[in-house]
Design a protein with these regions (language model features):
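Catalytic phosphate/metal-binding cores of nucleic-acid and nucleotide-processing enzymes, i.e., regions
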Residues: 1-185
Length: 185
């Protein structure tokens, strides 16, 4: 695999539309878009939702969108093991936006990057710095993640994915046991 100094992942209206198109081919009953914007949700919007089930649904939908974009770009299982990250926001209006709120909302995308193997893990030993920038372009909404000074480690990625698979199997097994116990009552 060719190593790159920079890896760029862009979330825009085009790839959001294609994701939703694919999603609704298999989920025909859905009426409301499961992801409303290529932009991350503001922390203010995330924290207002107190229902954990709704919060988790938002997180899972954004993770699915993130995985779609990464696969579309051919970057799955890239295994970035060391990098700096810049998140660039393009806002469609001149309404005031707090970057810290939007940067905090990027957690859902970064979790998706880990799950699909673009990055080995999202901890501080793999992502050393996170910075943000923004601009206004009338009518355009997008978010661009740029990983720079990248180092890659496919062996570490495989180890982390194997551990995560075991952890997921144990979690699923535990959930199945809890359902069985609750049905017996």
């Amino acid at each position: 695999m060719e190593e790159k100094d920079k890896v760029v992942v862009e979330f825009n209206q085009d790839n959001l539309d294609r994701f939703l198109n694919e999603y609704y081919k298999t989920h025909r009953k859905g009426k409301k878009p499961i992801v409303e914007s290529p932009m991350s949700r503001s922390l203010n919007k995330m924290l207002v939702i107190t229902n954990r089930i709704v919060q988790n649904a938002h997180k899972q939908n954004m993770k699915a969108y993130t995985c779609f974009v990464v696969k579309d770009l051919g970057l799955e299982n890239l295994g970035i093991s060391s990098a700096n990250l810049n998140v660039h926001f393009v806002f469609p209006t001149k309404i005031r936006h707090d970057l810290d709120n939007f940067l905090g909302g990027c957690k859902e995308q970064v979790d998706g990057f880990s799950e699909i193997g673009l990055i080995v893990d999202d901890d501080y030993s793999h992502i050393h710095t996170i910075s943000s920038s923004a601009e206004y372009i009338k009518g355009e909404t997008k978010m661009i993640f740029t990983f720079s000074n990248c180092k890659f480690d496919l062996e570490e990625l495989k180890e982390v994915q194997a551990k995560e698979k075991i952890r997921k199997e144990k979690r699923d097994e535990s959930m199945a046991e809890k359902k069985t116990v609750s049905k017996k009552k």
